Amino acid sequence: MKTKTLTRKEFLKLAGVAVGTVSGVAKFVSTAQAKIKESELTQVKSDFIYSCCNMCGGQSGIMCRVVNGKLVKIDPNPYNPNNFSNISTDFFENVEKEGTCICPKGNAGISTLYDKDRLQKPLKRANPKKGIGVDPRWKEISWEEAYVEITKRLKGLRDNGEAHKLLWFSEDHSFTHIQSDFCKLFGTPNYSMHSNLCDTARKASFKMVMGLDRPLMDALQSKYILLFGWNPLSATKWSHLPRIITRGIENGAKMVVVDPYLSYTANKAQEWIPIIPGTDGAMALAMGHVIIRDKLYDEIFIKDWTIGFEKYAEYVKDKTPQWAEKITTVPAKTIERIAIEFAATKPQVVDVWSGPGQHSNGVQGGRAIAILAALVGGCDRPGTLLIPDNKGNKHIEVEPDEIANKTLKEKRFDQLKELYPFGHKSGIYCQAFSDLAEGKGPYKPKMAMIVFQNIMMSVPGLKTVEKALANLEFVVVNDIFLSETALMADIVVPGTTYLERYDLNTHWVTWPVLGLRQPVVKPIFGQPVEYEFVTELGRRLGLKEADGNDIFWVGRMSGERIADKTKWYEEFLSKELKEGAPKMTLEELKALPGAVWVSKSGTRYEKYKDAISPEKLADSILEGNIAYSKKPDGAKDKPIGLIIEGGAAVHGFSTPSRKVEFYNADFAKKKDAWGRPVDPLPVYEPRDWQPDANYPLYLINWKEASHTHTRTQNNALLVELKPDNPLMVNVVTAEKMGLNNDDLVWVESIYGRVKAKVKLTKGMHPEVVGLQHGFGHWALGEIAKDAGTSDTVLRPCKADPLSGQAIHKQCCVKVYKA
């Protein structure tokens, strides 16, 4: 704990409740930057601990006030750029004047910490039958009993050469390295994370074009912001987004949002363009047609830094605005005007997220949108899509022993590498659960470890997921609530909140920044922190590295045997920090202002022009104008750079050609998960589920600042903001159907039906209905239970065939009175 002695003025700034409105969209808590000086010390004292939030994946910096061991308030960390801006000059020059912010979820974390419905002790299932509505007949057991039973099951798999039959599912931002280390040392290739439920289609789209999977929007310096299916002013991926977009608009930018639903972001845009779900790629191709037809593209950038432009130009020759209008319902004149405005306004930025991505055609649609940035030279320049210099802690890879290596050679159960040419390392949840339910796949898994994941509510295809979990011999869930997924478990062990544990957070800004998550209070039920739980399992199983290193006992800094698991983990983190960009220990990070490491390098632009060192170039293999690194045996390995006109060797983009790629002939050599060749071009094809006479409406879902996925609906403070999720129906559509506000209706697809409450709006495409994702719990807690509607039963458990992205937004329904 860090004790600060503050002036009265600073105390009021930091500890007072200051609620402001960012862009008029959602309530954010803001505080002015506080600089503590020895000369300002007075008798006013308070204890603050700097940390990082984990109420969502944004990982905002937080400052927690603790009194007598109890958390009483959460404020934004005034030192963390993630709470302010993704551009370094903006942060350094303006944060002290404006102050930082956190979203409602971050401010409400205290309610989750002290939720009366939290799990307190391990539970063991007494009823072997599993399913929705089945009473598990829980029996409370001790931690020792839980460890013994879980270890016995794990040991049985490993001793029988079946370690690969363990499936491990983890949340993305919490103690992931120790979990993946455990899986590798145990011998299972089946470590998976949440990402493939979120934005892996976007990742694949941008990687195919620019070579990296997460460029960041520089809205602050842009003059034209074009967003496809993204709601950053409310579904705040990072808490700095509302501010930089607002400041960009104040600085003269026009914002245009393409979305079937009038989201908070669309509401604040100068123009909202409603579109048929899953047709965004067609609109992007038509825009490309106009930009090329009118010669509005950046000729120099395309000549020097792209490949395949001619083939793309030929492909979009007939992709006219009139062609796209028939597909999207967006008027041809609107498409033409937006294309011209976008290309003519410098600098401009275009971005796409989960709205278009979570369809069967999401990757190619996103790729068509990403190419719009290339057409206008909007890559890694101020006001465009930036390549983040994302450096932080370094994961120190472990070396598994001979026993583990045997089973690590088995295929992943989800067949990530074999089936999904642009799959993400997070795995393919939908493939795994579909095969598990149907008895397919390369082998039959026997056990699952599910950490901080409510899979029953978050994976599409509820009935499939239910059957899949029931088909496993043994399921362990580690969570803070008795969730719907926990009800399918054989043993449930209570976890901790982010306010009770450590983590390192490499922040998604454009220059290197790393924030520390550290315990604000001790685990309130005396339960082990998740990394202690994993460490204890590793110790009981006797897992070691190939050289015999007793890795779960030996400290990574001291090399000495450490019994205290928290101290052991502190050395684990220190080693990652020392080997990574910060080059410091955990204690040194704690001592920095706000417990956040902020690189002085700042945001850099046009990094594709960075020179390759003469030494690196001399040790490379040149083929044509591309430099390749060497394998240990001297053979050609990966491309590392590009020889440009004049003979200079530069980094280029991280694609095979080291240029932005409109076209890649090698894609045709790959097949997607459905057995089809991958098109070298960003082709448009209709999504594979369309409305018909029986199910005439598109159903979509979205997220808002009020809740995170399916995990915050028991948070009393957030439920005050958003208690449920009515079905939003266009007023014209509702009139035709005879529906009014607050009517109870059935929403039915070919897979099932759910009951919902109607809310009429003009802000919805008339062929579309939709609701906020995350509600409709039958477990989790007293507040969450029976509030709102879940739509997971309405969709199949299905993944996009290129990236493995779960298809959350592709659904056709009929709506009728209940």
Go through each PLM region and give its residues.
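Flexible glycine/proline-rich, aromatic-decorated loop/lid segments
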Residues: Y261-Y264, S483-R517
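N-terminal export/assembly segments and adjacent metallocofactor-ligating motifs
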Residues: K2-D294, D318, W323, P331, ...
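Short beta-alpha connecting loops at secondary-structure transitions
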Residues: A269-I275, E500, V513-P523
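Long, contiguous, secondary-structure-rich segments that constitute the structural scaffold
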Residues: E530-L592, T710-M728, V732-A818
